[in-house]
Amino acid sequence: MVGDDVSVEDLLKGIIVASGNDACVALAEGIAGTEEQFAILMTEKAKEIGMENTNFSNSSGINDPYNYSTVKDILIMSNYLIKNYPEYYEYFKEKEFTWDRTGGDPITQGNRNPLLYKNIGADGIKTGYLAVEKYSLASSIQKNERRLIAVASGFNTKNDRSRQSIKLLTWGITNFDLIKISSKDTALTEVDVWLGKTNKVGVYTKENIFTTIKKARKKKIKAFIEYDGPIEAPITKDQELGKLKVLFNNELINTYPVYALNDVKKVNLFSRIIKSINYLIWGDV
């Protein structure tokens, strides 16, 4: 009702759960002054996160020739949302939202995402409809540490949109595996140290590293540590020491920095001389 105070959290839930265009406008004007200025900020953020073929002309996504995106860009945005704003992504799986308005009965509205009502474990994301692109849906499920996001558009009916999105997610779960390459903050392997009080030091990655691959091609994934070694002491904990390289079919697909798991102090002068002699004679670090 006119004059009601609505919290930002309720406005967000109104947008996410109930697809409220009025809530979009209210937040846009509250943040940027006008909806037009907010759309400019939206477009700038889209470019920043890699959405190269997207332009926003309004805050709600209603039909406008200057309001456009692509399936790929919506996938990028969905992934960014889930990774960076998990506290808000929780709202996307809520099946309904009730607003206790002032001076009237509470209003309850349901989530329009049809996959939330299917027994497949979907927890988002959003439906859409435009005159040209017809019905669209960005959807997501998570099973066993593995998240799949499917974005589909161009369906003539809501039923087609729902059915094909389920098929796409099911195909991804059935035909692909998630392989864990490295566990965050856990020793991955050891590298050689020169002139240190220990001859080796463990290395780790600062993030969990996974790769998704077709089940039939799992054996073609390989990973190794590349470093310029032996690495001369002293070494400090968290010092970058090399790269973890991930290959598919012997072609590089990703590179990640690896860091020292702990400090390694340099040996004293006498020990350095002995180690140098050993290295010259035996090649022993």
Question: What is each residue range found by the language model?
Answer:
Residues M1-K83:
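Active-site-adjacent loops and short helices of periplasmic peptidoglycan-processing enzymes
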